Amino acid sequence: MHVVVLGSGVVGVASAWYLRQAGHEVTVIDREPGPALETSAANAGQISPGYAAPWAAPGVPLKAIKWMFQRHAPLAISLDGTHFQLKWMWQMLRNCDTRHYMQNKGRMVRLAEYSRDCLKALRESTGIQYEGRQGGTLQLFRTEQQYENASRDIAVLESEGVPFRLLKAAELAQVEPALADVAHKLTGGLQLPNDETGDCQLFTTRLAQMAEAAGVVFRYNTPVDRLLSEGQRIYGVKCGDEVIKADGYVMAFGSYSTAMLKGIVDIPVYPLKGYSLTIPIADESGAPVSTVLDETYKIAITRFDNRIRVGGMAEIVGFNTELLKPRQETLEMVVRDLYPRGGHIEQAKFWTGLRPMTPDGTPVVGRTEFKNLWLNTGHGTLGWTMACGSGQLLSDIISGRTPAIPFEDLSVARYAPGFTPSSSHRLHGAHP
């Protein structure tokens, strides 16, 4: 049967690919002239299942107050007085305790680990190239307290069977040789050897090309006005003077999902603004090998073939996409501090994007009360990490297959009292 996927970012394109592989007729609609031109364009480039964790964590409320007075703070808040922003922040605050943190991180790691496996299978079956590396990820600690706090995350990693190594400062250069020059600034690190890296935009573009060759129709330059509904069904997508109809619809509009679903499904997906730099490599020996995460500044530094991607920070400022010079200076400060010989920072390209974040950090994947509407949104800073797994999972749900991982706690049910995700609505016409 015919499924319309709304959105051509990495999550939308992955959804389209796996739906097509399941035998569905698929149309992708997006306002941009091509795939991965908004949030997926220049993210941090890391595929880090073990580091999948919610921003809502114990201690964050107090840290947020402290960060208000710091020049290089990882989180910034600008209150706009809207009910949406205030409600979202209150919901996030309610998740900032140990019980919720462990629960949320556990399901995020589960989906992210599955997604990495799906990406590996896709890579092996198609040969897709995206400047990918399988060199692991290294989280860097600058204080003894950060090193000691790693035990909380290690408990989740152990419960999920994720391999890891806790390293002292003197051992960091074994993983990232260039850090030998700055080891005296660090107290240690947590390495996850199974993590990966890659250019998300390049991956999405090539997967879209493969999907198109397989029969997926892409409707670019097509802004969506609204979804048309009657009773408990969606009957079309209004795009200007045109109404595009299908048997099923998948919402993968990222930060714009909430507004597009207004009056249909209430989901708390908020735009969390982030920034990145893309830097040409100057000295191979001074550049990162894979990805490092600076725990203090919440910034990732990732190696592509001939470039370094530096990404991070979070601003709760609504849909503001202004490029702020102080944020660029923070990214430059961190990469100069850790990899002073690595790149031509004066040639860096500065970018910003809006990550679709839920209050608990977990994406919203699965069916809704509407019989032919499914969601695949709210992946926050982990869209690249979770895209393939979310796409495969959603395809299985829509096609009536039994997914490979537990999925009910990923649904919109946690924000919709009384809604039960277990009774699936299968689209006929897919391969069994």
From Swiss-Prot:
GO MF, one example: D-amino-acid dehydrogenase activity
Repeat in keyword set: no
UniProt catalytic activity: a D-alpha-amino acid + A + H2O = a 2-oxocarboxylate + AH2 + NH4(+)
A single BP term in Gene Ontology: D-alanine catabolic process
Keyword Flavoprotein in record: yes
GO cellular component: cytoplasm; plasma membrane
Matches recorded under SUPFAM superfamilies: FAD-linked reductases, C-terminal domain (SSF54373), FAD/NAD(P)-binding domain (SSF51905)
A Pfam family annotated for this UniProt entry: DAO
EC number: 1.4.99.-
InterPro entries with a match to the protein in the record: DadA, FAD-dep_OxRdtase, FAD/NAD-bd_sf
Superkingdom, taxonomy of origin: Bacteria
Positions annotated to bind FAD: 3-17
Metabolic or biological pathway, per its Swiss-Prot or TrEMBL entry: Amino-acid degradation; D-alanine degradation; NH(3) and pyruvate from D-alanine: step 1/1
Cofactor(s) this protein cannot do without: FAD
UniProt keyword list: FAD, Flavoprotein, Oxidoreductase
Similarity comment: family membership: Belongs to the DadA oxidoreductase family.
The protein's role, per its UniProt record: Oxidative deamination of D-amino acids.
PANTHER family listed in its UniProt record: D-AMINO ACID DEHYDROGENASE, SARCOSINE DEHYDROGENASE-RELATED
Protein name (record): D-amino acid dehydrogenase
Species of the source: Cronobacter sakazakii (strain ATCC BAA-894) (Enterobacter sakazakii)
Lineage: Bacteria, Pseudomonadati, Pseudomonadota, Gammaproteobacteria, Enterobacterales
This protein's encoding gene: dadA
